[in-house]
Each structure stands twice: as C-alpha cells, then as structure tokens.
Amino acid sequence: MAVQQNKKSRSARDMRRSHDALEASTLSVEKSTGEVHLRHHVSPEGVYRGRKVIDKGADE
C-alpha cells in the first residue's frame, strides 16, 4: 500500500478539492419547438439553433 512521504496540509487538500463540486447541467429551450436540451447539443427533434440539422425518418 502506498504511504505518503510528507503530510499534506489542510489548505493543500482543500485547494485540490476546490474543483470537485458538482454543478447542475445548463439547459436551453429551443426557440422554434420549445423543447429543453443540453447547451450546444441537438434537441431530440433534430433541431439546433432554430435549424433542422437531423432529418428523422418516419421509422424513428
């Protein structure tokens, strides 16, 4: 088992952990359809920034 050579201070430990906090994902509402989707992602209907970018067929 690994053993540390020198003890890390509380400050060093907390500074390392400062980026570990969880954040809620940012959601956007599509203007044309009103759907909610992740930022910079295509909506489930295939619309991105008001334009149809994925043509979903009748079988899907």
Curated annotation (Swiss-Prot):
UniProt-listed Pfam families: Ribosomal_L32p
Single GO BP term: translation
Biased composition (Basic and acidic residues): 11-22
GO cellular component terms, A-Z: large ribosomal subunit
A single MF term (Gene Ontology): structural constituent of ribosome
Protein keywords: Ribonucleoprotein, Ribosomal protein
Keyword Mitochondrion: no
Family per similarity comment: Belongs to the bacterial ribosomal protein bL32 family.
PANTHER family found in the cross-reference section: 50S RIBOSOMAL PROTEIN L32 (PTHR35534), LARGE RIBOSOMAL SUBUNIT PROTEIN BL32 (PTHR35534:SF1)
Protein name: Large ribosomal subunit protein bL32
Provenance organism: Ectopseudomonas mendocina (strain ymp) (Pseudomonas mendocina)
Classification of source organism: Bacteria, Pseudomonadati, Pseudomonadota, Gammaproteobacteria, Pseudomonadales
Gene: rpmF
